[in-house]
């Protein structure tokens, strides 16, 4: 057993000295102190991860927990391996932290297998690039931003535009409609939201199909910089068992931010905007592990907080390079009360291509975007001169655009308790049929309010009837 001692503690950085063999970089070290209840000194169980070798038999480590109570001279044991976490079915329905310990007060996790969190991405020859659409049941995604099975989708948005609610709805739809396993990584987000998500999943019955991995805002940077890797390790196990897994990362920006904090603590020279010099390397190491192999697939959805709504921020730009599609959430659309507040003109997907989604889907999607684009161009004229000054064709375009805009909204299952409107899952063929009918002018006579917060197009007619509107045949 390789034993050393603590020689220096600066915040969450701990330097340790070993007389014999030095622990390797990324090895986990353990500090176990019994404490003294009589003196009010609590027990101490802390895991450290070796970050660098300093020379003179010293290593610099990052703490995976609070360093309160650490003193020089404490005994440190080298585990001889990286942090390992439990994987497999026993993890489903549970909340674990960065080192794989349960934090849901439901007893220990009886897992047979434990995997290290630092492993290489699958070899190029093991990967299986697929271009198949993944149905989400959310109209705006399925039509305009089709998800790739085994791909990576990024969700960009400032604070309070609905990123977390969309992720919760996606987990609900995957569990209820696809029977798939999901892994949720809470990276540096609010503990209250993590708790709400857990209770919501318990309430809606999807919890047995989800593994929750939390390293929230109150945790030290070492935890937030590693929690995504822990979640990915859990997901990789299910993929290698032949399953299609969904991993949700909320929020990938906090992963970068934690890396920046750790980098500063380790004394590295910062690069652009104060980020770590290894920004793209760290992002690449994480993203390359999210992939499809011959055995199974990992599809990921990553919420990306955009600081000050600036899409050119280096952290945001580093994520962009890895994505198959981008869902841009817009504050202007949220202000109109249209949720999910997805910007239909800014959001993109690699597979919105007739060779993948088919001609009809492609034509309808592009048709919707062109009508909305024309409406956007006409808004200045409407604001200055009024809608009456437009030509008859443009008036019709504006009326259809407003209906399309409202039809892109949808009631969510996970928001039922707040809105009182039952959630809707809309099949892809129903989505295409509905938007095609609006573009073809079949619903030009119905009021735009009837298109707001409904599921398939049939519900528009029902809603119009309830509003006392009779169709002109």
From Swiss-Prot:
The reaction(s) this protein catalyses: ATP + H2O + 4 H(+)(in) = ADP + phosphate + 5 H(+)(out)
SMART domains, per database record: AAA (SM00382)
Key word Manganese present: no
Main location: membrane
GO molecular function: ATP binding; ATP hydrolysis activity; proton-transporting ATP synthase activity, rotational mechanism
EC number, UniProt record: 7.1.2.2
Residues where ATP binds: 157-164
Cell compartment(s), UniProt: Cell inner membrane
One of the Pfam families matching this protein, by short name: ATP-synt_VA_C
Protein's membrane topology: Peripheral membrane protein
Family, as annotated: Belongs to the ATPase alpha/beta chains family.
Entries under PANTHER family matching the protein: ATP SYNTHASE (PTHR15184), ATP SYNTHASE SUBUNIT BETA, MITOCHONDRIAL (PTHR15184:SF71)
Name under which the protein is recorded: ATP synthase subunit beta
Organism: Thermodesulfovibrio yellowstonii (strain ATCC 51303 / DSM 11347 / YP87)
Gene name of this polypeptide: atpD
């Amino acid at each position: 057993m390789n034993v050393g001692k603590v020689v220096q503690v600066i915040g969450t950085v701990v330097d340790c000295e070993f007389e014999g063999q030095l622990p390797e970089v990324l090895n986990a070290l353990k500090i176990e102190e019994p404490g003294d209840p009589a003196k009010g000194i609590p027990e101490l169980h802390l895991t450290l991860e070796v970050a660098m070798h300093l020379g003179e038999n010293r290593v610099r480590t990052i703490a995976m927990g609070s360093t309160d109570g650490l003193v020089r001279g404490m005994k440190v044991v080298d585990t001889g391996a990286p942090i390992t976490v439990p994987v497999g079915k026993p993890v489903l329905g549970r909340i674990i932290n960065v080192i794989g310990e349960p934090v849901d007060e439901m007893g220990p996790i009886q897992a047979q297998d434990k995997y290290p969190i630092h492993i290489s991405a699958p070899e190029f020859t093991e990967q299986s690039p697929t271009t198949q659409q993944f149905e989400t049941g959310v109209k705006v995604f399925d039509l305009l931003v089709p998800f790739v099975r085994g791909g990576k989708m990024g969700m960009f948005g400032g604070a309070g535009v609905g990123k977390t609610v969309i992720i919760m709805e996606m987990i609900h739809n995957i569990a209820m409609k696809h029977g798939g396993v999901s892994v949720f990584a809470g990276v540096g987000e609010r503990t209250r939201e993590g708790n709400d998500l857990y209770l919501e999943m318990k309430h809606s019955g999807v919890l047995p199909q989800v593994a929750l991995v939390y390293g929230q805002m109150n945790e030290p940077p070492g935890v937030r910089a590693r929690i995504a890797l822990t979640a990915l390790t859990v997901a990789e196990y299910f993929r290698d068992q032949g399953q299609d897994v969904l991993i949700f990362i909320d929020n990938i920006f906090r992963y970068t931010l934690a890396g920046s904090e750790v980098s500063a603590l380790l004394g590295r020279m910062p690069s652009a905007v104060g980020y770590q010099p290894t920004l793209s390397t760290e992002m690449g190491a994480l993203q390359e592990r999210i992939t499809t192999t011959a055995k199974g697939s990992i599809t990921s959805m990553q919420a990306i907080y955009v600081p000050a709504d600036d899409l050119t921020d280096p952290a945001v730009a580093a994520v962009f390079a890895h994505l198959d599609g981008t869902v841009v959430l817009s504050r202007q659309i949220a202000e109109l009360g249209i949720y999910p507040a997805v910007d239909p003109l800014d959001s993109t997907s690699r597979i919105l291509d007739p060779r993948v989604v088919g001609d009809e889907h492609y034509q309808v999607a592009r048709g919707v975007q062109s009508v909305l684009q024309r409406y956007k161009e006409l808004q200045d004229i409407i604001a200055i001169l009024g809608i009456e000054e437009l030509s008859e064709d443009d008036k019709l375009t504006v009326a259809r655009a407003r209906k399309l805009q409202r039809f892109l909204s949808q009631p969510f299952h996970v928001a039922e308790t707040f809105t009182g409107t039952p959630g809707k899952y809309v099949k892809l063929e129903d989505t295409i049929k509905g938007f095609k009918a609006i573009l073809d002018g079949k619903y030009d006579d119905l009021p735009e309010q009837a298109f707001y917060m409904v599921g398939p197009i049939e519900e528009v007619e029902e809603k119009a009837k309830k509003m006392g509107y009779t169709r002109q045949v």
